[in-house]
Amino acid sequence: LSSAASDVYKRQPDDEFKAAASSFAAELFKDNYSKGKTTLVSPLSVLTALALVQNGAEGETLAQLERALGGLDRDALNKYMRAYCDFLSAGDELKIANSVWTDSSVEAKQAFLQKAVDSYSAQIFSAPLSSKKTVSSINSWVKKNTDGMIPKIIENADRDAVMMLINAIAFDAKWETPYKRSDIEKLEFTSYSGSKKKTDFMCSTENIYLKDGGTVGFMKPYKNGRFAFAALLPNEDVNIDDYIASLSGEKLMKIFSSAKKNEEVDVKMPKFKAEYSTQLIDTLKKMGIEDAFDRKSADFSSLIDKNDGAYIGTVMHKTFIEVDQEGTRAAAATLVGISKMSMPAINPVCLNRPFVYMIVDTETNLPLFIGVQTEI
């Protein structure tokens, strides 16, 4: 299938898209967080995988997906996603890849595959999905498209799987101002459980201060300024669980739009690394997507011919992040399996207890990754 490069498939991110995407990001993070657990999700990865799958849905299944994905109709979302992903991956820092794997026993609808190519530049594969060989091809595809950060997404294939839609993202960026050895000091981090541990903290003066009743934070730009690392530290008297529960798309947008630029922040941030993997079905059900996971109610009649009760049997999401003095490497992969059947002291921010962080696209202020670090 050839992809037409024309702009008919694009709509530039505007306020309507930003509101939908930030609300999806906040809900996904909030509904997936469980008390005290270090968590990392990539709203961009999950949104892309689900936006891709909704092109095969109809009826109430489609309506629920549209609502959960921020309330845009699917044609508009396809156009926004095309423009947004092209825009994000224009530099070297971020790579986004999509693929559709169809079991050799079924015929995927041409119109669905064409949309996957036109709007998501997806690679299309057809293979016996439950074979070990295909599982290993899928894992190598994910490993390659996350620069090796996520070596595998599935252990073995579900015998009932008729299609797998996979999104992979790799982010690798250096800080605009890297840390020197003299910027590193050993400080104590108090984890969610209260245990204390000495670890390497990176110290710097930043000049974008974030404040939101009950939390303080900062943004630290990566080289070229396209992306930034943002961290939010709830005040001592604010419980991190309550803070996360209070997040919303509007609140996220507001934190960034009211960022105080050129206001010095004395930052101390631990080096950290996190790997996370989750089966997202329960989270997505909390977000109102129900029929897609129910073999009786699911309507994926635009996905495959002879649609015999196709439903979503798995939504695997894996993420990885590493933040050190050089910069940040992060990756995410989402697999949707369709089964049938100058006064630095003014604003000190020391991330020495659980904190929320994001990798943000500075043009739209949308989080590509959002996580909470509860231990080091």
Features from the language model and the residues they span:
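Non-catalytic, conformational "gating/processing" segments within enzyme and secreted inhibitor domains
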Residues: 36, 78-235, 242, 260-342
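Extended hydrophobic
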Residues: 165, 216-232, 344-376
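Post-signal peptide N-terminal segment of secreted/secretory-pathway proteins
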Residues: 30-94
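Single conserved hydrophobic/aromatic residue that forms the stacking wall/gate
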Residues: 1-9
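Mature N-terminal segment immediately following signal peptide/propeptide cleavage
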Residues: 22-29
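Acidic/histidine-rich, surface-exposed loop or edge segments in extracytoplasmic proteins
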Residues: 10-11, 44-48, 60-67, 117-125, ...
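Short, cationic low-complexity segments
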Residues: 248-262, 343-348
